[in-house]
């Protein structure tokens, strides 16, 4: 029984990670009319991933590195622990609103805490999933996904109302346990958790594909491939990126951003 609860806790912690879908997608296709190198402003909102939780120095935060790489000033308004509802409310904060209005690009990292804040529902759902099969999503869990989609859509719309010319970047959720050997009885933790991560990414994909000037940066493949990107081990449950992980995120962000700039 202890092993079962530990396994459920591991899967739940995966869902703290932040969030989006598969490819770089936007109705506009490319970034146009962007300020020159050295005159750019990036604003970040979201959760602990963007906030750089666990780092000794914010100079190692992937958003700091990314902004430096593209010649931009960074305003980081992300707050550890925020879920999508709290991020939505934060848009009315005076500093956050001002930073959004002055930004050329806004990075959004949010999603995992919507599930972590409802851990009782998720633990029950994970127990039921083990009994009923991998495709089983109880109504209570489906409601969390639905609420998240509504909040993310409102976040994007509010940003657009404040700054219609800005580009919005949403990043994917990664799974830090895919390269670890976390197994309980016949259950592979990484693969089991991936169902919930994939469903969350699908929710974000459904929202992002309807929005103009919104790009999705898929960081998951690069992050999932290297266990050194994460603090977590078989003995320590921690999904946050290490300094190495932040460097990986920064590289992926920089490559994808530069690839979207119109020639």
Regions found by a protein language model. Give the residues of each.
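Oxyanion-hole/transition-state-stabilizing segment in secreted/luminal serine hydrolases
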Residues: 88-145
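Catalytic His-Asp segment of secreted/periplasmic serine-dependent ester chemistry enzymes
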Residues: 173-263
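Structural recognition of the beta-strand scaffold that forms the well-ordered cores
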Residues: 41-46, 74-78, 104-109, 167-172, ...
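Positively charged n-region of N-terminal signal peptides that target proteins for export
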Residues: 1-6
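Serine-esterase "nucleophile elbow" of acetyl-processing enzymes
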Residues: 25-80, 96-98
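Solvent-exposed loop/turn segments at secondary-structure junctions
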Residues: 48-51, 79-85, 112-116, 174-178, ...
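Short amphipathic alpha-helices and their capping/turn segments at secondary-structure boundaries
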Residues: 29-37, 87-106, 154-165
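C-terminal motif of bacterial Sec signal peptides marking the signal peptidase cleavage site
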Residues: 17-20
């Amino acid at each position: 029984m202890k092993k079962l609860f530990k396994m459920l806790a591991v899967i739940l912690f995966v869902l703290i990670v932040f969030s989006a879908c598969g490819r770089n997608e936007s109705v506009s296709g490319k970034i146009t009319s962007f300020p020159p190198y050295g005159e750019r402003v990036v604003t970040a909102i979201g959760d602990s991933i963007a906030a750089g939780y666990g780092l000794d120095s914010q100079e190692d935060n992937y958003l700091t590195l990314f902004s430096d790489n593209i010649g931009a000033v960074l305003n980081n308004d992300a707050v550890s622990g925020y879920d999508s509802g709290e991020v939505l409310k934060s848009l009315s904060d005076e500093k956050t609103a001002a930073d959004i209005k002055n930004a050329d690009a806004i990075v959004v990292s949010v999603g995992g805490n919507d599930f972590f804040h409802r851990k009782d529902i998720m633990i029950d759902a994970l127990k039921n999933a083990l009994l009923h099969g991998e495709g089983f999503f109880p109504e209570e869990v489906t409601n969390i996904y639905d609420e998240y989609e509504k909040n993310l859509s409102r976040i994007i719309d509010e940003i657009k109302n404040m700054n219609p010319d800005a580009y919005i970047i949403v990043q994917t959720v990664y799974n830090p346990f895919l390269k670890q050997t976390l197994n309980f009885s016949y259950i592979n933790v990484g693969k089991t958790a991936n169902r919930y991560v994939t469903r969350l990414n699908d929710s974000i994909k459904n929202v992002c594909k309807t929005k103009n000037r919104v790009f999705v940066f898929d960081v998951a493949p690069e992050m999932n491939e290297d266990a050194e990107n994460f603090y977590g081990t078989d003995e320590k449950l921690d999904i946050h990126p290490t300094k190495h992980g932040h460097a990986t995120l920064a590289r992926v962000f920089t490559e994808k951003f530069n690839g979207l700039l119109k020639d």
